[in-house]
């Protein structure tokens, strides 16, 4: 038992936790802004943001205050009742998007599960039971529930769990003819990330997204945008779909919405919501007052012109620093993404070295992520300072000098 262990170390994980993860060799114990400290007091500059989650950095003072205040009032009452923070948050999300209805949950997977169920239920009720095909894309990622992992286009995550849910097909990302070859009148939805995250930080082409929208209209299929990773300011717009001037029928968000506190949301229209009756779907913890009070504050802070312009400026600064690094090392073939979701594409021959590079960065005090086989992913706090960017890039440079 944990109580008998005098010292908690990385080895404790190997003894206690189901090995679905392979954590770093150090254990963070404290965070503030874009900095983390481990058990030994070593400081790190965090360019991972908890995988695009800590939108306002670690332990933001406003969120800490809101959490303390709400924790003294009400934690949980279940959805037998509604609550004020949930209704205030729903109103803010609706007023800043295409949507008119919101469903709250706890994770991105739950938000997507709700979206996929909603699409099938709506199509069955409005059209017929055969209209249940969902089209997704290879190299996509939509969560770890059995339904969402099957919709995601990566067999390594969905194989060996038995028969998969039927009527799920995959097309090639950014190739419209691949979609045209499988979409038909039995398609209930097309789901896509506007920037494929796990697939390597690959943005969707504007023309591709617009043609997908037209195909969905043609076949009476719903268009679902999975903005779990891109939503709430990550791309310098509140939602990434604003860059494309294309509206979805259903939108899912999570990660940055709670800046580290578990919350997600599925947004849709009154027309689609009209088929839903009490009991069709639900959640125990979704929309709880604690999560919603924090998310409301996050949206208040992020959803301003000045803040979102700041995200774009920070993105340009990071890319400028990366280009300076690349002039010295010739490490990257491409830097892609939008806002503060950045993919650094390594030369193909360096793909086998990516984990060695990550460890070198850790040792130098910089935390980054991977995305696919040869992409380093940066998804820092949206409030990361210029000082932290410059210092982080200096450490990045030093790490590469030592490992290459």
UniProtKB/Swiss-Prot annotation:
GO terms (BP aspect): L-arginine biosynthetic process; lysine biosynthetic process via diaminopimelate
Cofactor binding note from Swiss-Prot or TrEMBL: Binds 1 pyridoxal phosphate per subunit.
One GO CC term on file: cytoplasm
Primary location recorded for the protein, binned into one broad class: cytoplasm
Enzyme Commission number(s): 2.6.1.11, 2.6.1.17
Pfam families registered for this protein in UniProt: Aminotran_3 (PF00202)
Reaction(s) catalysed by this chain's protein: N(2)-acetyl-L-ornithine + 2-oxoglutarate = N-acetyl-L-glutamate 5-semialdehyde + L-glutamate; N-succinyl-(2S,6S)-2,6-diaminopimelate + 2-oxoglutarate = (S)-2-succinylamino-6-oxoheptanedioate + L-glutamate
Binding site residues for pyridoxal 5'-phosphate: 108-109, 141, 226-229, 284
Keyword terms: Amino-acid biosynthesis, Aminotransferase, Arginine biosynthesis, Cytoplasm, Lysine biosynthesis, Pyridoxal phosphate, Transferase
Residues modified as N6-(pyridoxal phosphate)lysine: 255
Residues reported in the UniProt entry to bind N(2)-acetyl-L-ornithine: 144, 283
Compartments, as annotated in UniProt: Cytoplasm
Gene Ontology molecular function: identical protein binding; N2-acetyl-L-ornithine:2-oxoglutarate 5-aminotransferase activity; pyridoxal phosphate binding; succinyldiaminopimelate transaminase activity
Keyword Cytoplasm listed: yes
Family matches, as InterPro entries: AcOrn/SuccOrn_fam (IPR004636), Aminotrans_3 (IPR005814), Aminotrans_3_PPA_site (IPR049704), Class-III_PLP-dep_AT (IPR050103), PyrdxlP-dep_Trfase (IPR015424), PyrdxlP-dep_Trfase_major (IPR015421), PyrdxlP-dep_Trfase_small (IPR015422)
Pathway(s) where this gene product acts: Amino-acid biosynthesis; L-arginine biosynthesis; N(2)-acetyl-L-ornithine from L-glutamate: step 4/4; Amino-acid biosynthesis; L-lysine biosynthesis via DAP pathway; LL-2,6-diaminopimelate from (S)-tetrahydrodipicolinate (succinylase route): step 2/3
Cofactor(s) annotated in UniProt: pyridoxal 5'-phosphate
CDD domains linked: OAT_like (cd00610)
Physiological role: Involved in both the arginine and lysine biosynthetic pathways.
Subunit structure, interactors included: Homodimer.
Family note: Belongs to the class-III pyridoxal-phosphate-dependent aminotransferase family. ArgD subfamily.
Record's protein name: Acetylornithine/succinyldiaminopimelate aminotransferase
Annotated organism of origin: Buchnera aphidicola subsp. Schizaphis graminum (strain Sg)
Name of the gene: argD
């Amino acid at each position: 038992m944990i109580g008998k262990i005098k010292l908690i170390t990385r080895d404790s994980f190997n003894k206690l936790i189901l090995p679905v993860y392979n954590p770093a060799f150090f254990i963070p114990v404290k965070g503030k802004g874009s900095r983390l400290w481990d058990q030994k007091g070593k400081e790190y500059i965090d360019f991972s943001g908890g995988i695009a989650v800590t939108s306002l950095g670690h332990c933001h003072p406003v969120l800490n205050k809101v959490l303390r205040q709400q924790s003294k009032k009400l934690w949980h009452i279940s959805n037998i009742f509604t609550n004020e923070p949930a209704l205030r948050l729903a109103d803010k999300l609706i007023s800043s998007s295409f949507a008119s209805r919101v469903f709250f949950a706890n994770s991105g997977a739950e938000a997507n599960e709700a979206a996929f169920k909603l699409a099938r239920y709506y199509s069955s009720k409005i059209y017929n039971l055969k209209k249940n095909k969902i089209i997704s894309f290879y190299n996509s990622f939509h969560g770890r529930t059995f339904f969402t992992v099957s919709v995601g286009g990566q067999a390594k995550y969905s194989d060996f769990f038995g028969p998969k849910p039927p009527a799920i097909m995959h097309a090639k990302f950014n190739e419209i003819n691949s979609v045209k070859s499988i979409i038909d009148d039995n398609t209930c939805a097309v789901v896509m990330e506007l920037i494929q995250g796990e697939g390597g930080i690959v943005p969707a082409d504007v023309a591709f997204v617009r043609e997908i929208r037209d195909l969905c209209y043609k076949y009476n299929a719903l268009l679902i945008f999975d903005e779990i990773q891109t939503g709430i300011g990550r791309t310098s717009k509140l939602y990434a779909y604003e860059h494309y001037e294309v509206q979805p029928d259903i939108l899912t968000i999570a990660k940055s919405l709670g800046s580290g506190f578990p919350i997600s949301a599925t947004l849709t229209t009154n027309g689609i919501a009209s088929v839903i009756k009490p009991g069709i779907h639900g959640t125990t913890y979704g929309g709880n007052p604690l999560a919603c009070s924090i998310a409301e504050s996050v949206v208040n802070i992020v959803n301003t012109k000045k803040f979102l312009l700041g995200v774009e400026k920070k993105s340009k600064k990071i890319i400028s620093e990366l280009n300076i690094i690349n002039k010295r090392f010739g490490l990257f073939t491409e830097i892609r993404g939008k806002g503060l979701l950045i993919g650094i594409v390594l030369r193909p021959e360096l793909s086998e070295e990516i984990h060695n590079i990550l460890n070198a960065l850790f040792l130098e005090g910089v935390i980054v992520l991977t995305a696919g086989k040869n992409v380093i992913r940066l998804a820092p706090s949206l409030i990361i300072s210029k000082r932290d960017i410059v210092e982080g890039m200096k450490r990045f440079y030093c790490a590469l000098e030592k490992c290459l």
